[in-house]
Amino acid sequence: MAKYLSTKTYGHNIGLSAVFRQPNAVHSHCHLLHGYSLQFKFTFGCSELDNKNWAVDFGGLKPLKAWLEDSFDHKTCVDVNDPHKQDFYDLQDKDLCEVREFEGVGAEKFAEHAWRFADKLVREMTDNRCWCESVECAEHGANSAIYTPFITQKISMAE
């Protein structure tokens, strides 16, 4: 369990404007293309601080920002199992979009994909002293999803 937590946010204002659709949401308008300027909040944990009393040196996170930009900045995010995947590649061939394929799309899956990249990066940067506790991906002010691989305990409000 982490003794120290620190957070880094890449806000809606940096322009991670991604478009995607939920191919399995046939009951909802979410099966249609729609997009957001995504926001990502990373929570990092560690048991010991470095010699500067930091959990994570945020200056070393440039590869994380570059990955976010390459994955989401003016990108069309497509589920690998989307039955219309080729249509998006046809648009890309006409220079009408840039496709990025993911094993699942949407705020929950984007948070998971970002966590996987960030956790590997931070562990390498710190010789496993730090890790990524969670990632929150927000579509806008009202909708977000959080991914954490760590076990969480549900407590009753009566306790």
Where are these regions (language model features)?
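Charge-rich, low-complexity N-terminal segments
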Residues: 1-159
